[in-house]
């Protein structure tokens, strides 16, 4: 079972998308400085059961379903992503899974496949000294799948503020 604790409609977490963001519990990463340590616990409601109704309610106003975490039941995550895709919504996963900092874009597919090949995927544990996605020094990376090249492209720079 995959559980979610709460939900929100967000506009910045996935560039160019209006996302239904779902905070997934049972996070295995336990990052120091985590802004949501309660998500480490196995708490919340059954997402697989509730997702059809959530998509019925919010589907016309969103373009993406964002899973903030992947929980501990990858089969349920895949089924939830599949349901969103069948409704013609994009999918995104934020994971604390670390990947090599010098990874080539063509190798990102290997790691994304572990998360059922979402349209967007954010990799990387939160490291306070490096900052989150908005920091140019972050270890975190956000990728978007490009169906034309059949590769994930690094879009992390879209989170960085432009100098004024």
Where are these regions (language model features)?
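Short, acidic Gly/Pro/Ser/Thr-rich loop/turn segments
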Residues: 29-32, 128, 150-152
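Alpha-helix C-terminal capping segments
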Residues: 55-59, 84
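Core AdoMet radical
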Residues: 35-48, 60-74, 89-105, 115, ...
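Short, flexible, glycine/charge-rich loop motifs used to bind or transfer phosphoryl groups or to couple energy/partner
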Residues: 11, 54-56, 109-112, 131-132
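A general structural detector for well-ordered alpha-helical segments in enzyme core domains, enriched
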Residues: 50-54, 76-81, 110-114
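P-loop/Walker A phosphate-binding loop and immediately adjacent motor/lid segment at beta-alpha junctions
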Residues: 73-81, 85, 131-164
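Residues that form or immediately flank small-molecule/cofactor binding pockets and catalytic motifs
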Residues: 9, 126, 147
């Amino acid at each position: 079972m995959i559980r979610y604790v709460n939900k929100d409609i967000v506009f910045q977490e996935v560039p160019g998308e209006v996302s239904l963001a779902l905070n997934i519990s049972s996070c295995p990463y336990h990052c120091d400085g985590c802004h949501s340590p309660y998500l480490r616990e196995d708490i919340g409601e059954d997402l697989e059961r509730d997702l059809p109704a959530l998509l019925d309610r919010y589907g016309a106003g969103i373009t993406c379903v964002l899973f903030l975490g992947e929980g501990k039941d990858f089969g349920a995550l895949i089924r939830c992503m599949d349901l969103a895709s069948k409704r013609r919504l994009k999918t995104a996963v934020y994971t604390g899974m670390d990947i090599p900092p010098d990874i080539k874009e063509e190798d990102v597919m290997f790691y994304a496949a572990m998360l059922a090949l979402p349209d967007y995927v954010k990799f990387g544990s939160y490291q306070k000294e490096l900052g989150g996605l908005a920091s140019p020094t972050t270890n975190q990376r956000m990728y978007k799948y490009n169906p034309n090249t059949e590769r994930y492209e690094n879009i992390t720079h879209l989170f960085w503020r432009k100098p004024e």
